[in-house]
Amino acid sequence: MKTFNYNRAEIKAGIVHFGVGNFHRAHLEAYTNLLLEDPSQRCWGVFGAMIMPTDGVLFNALKKDDGIYQLTTCSPSGEQDSMLIGSLVELAWGEIDSEPIIAKIASEEIKIISLTITEGGYKVDFNQSRSVFWYCLLYTSDAADE
């Protein structure tokens, strides 16, 4: 298995990402992980902001392993390639405490705030005009005003 080729203690979060699900971890984190191998790019670690009530199991699993996880890709021919991803250097779950998320967003170190919205991750009630994600944004906004 391939592993990352950098010292995680040297990595600073420059990205806050909302929605640290499978899609995010298989794409943005994988590319960020490769970028961090360049010593001049050690300011692009990811702060994972988890805001959904259902994020608890994933949050606890990632937190237990300090944000490090294994990514396995499969080629059309069936070959598998696994690597350790270390770019997720900080993690917070808004259900427990939203303050670290708000503070990180306000930090001068943060240059990018990104989010993942997938059709299966945020349930839309077509009888209503708003999705669960919209309510999470309102919740986060209300928390910032307190």
Model-derived segments and spans:
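Conserved phosphate/anionic-ligand binding catalytic regions in large, soluble enzymes, centered on
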Residues: 17-28
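Short alpha-helical segments and helix-capping/turn motifs at coil-helix boundaries
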Residues: 27-37, 94-103
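A glycine- and small-aliphatic-rich helix-loop capping segment at beta-alpha/alpha-beta transitions
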Residues: 34-35, 128-137
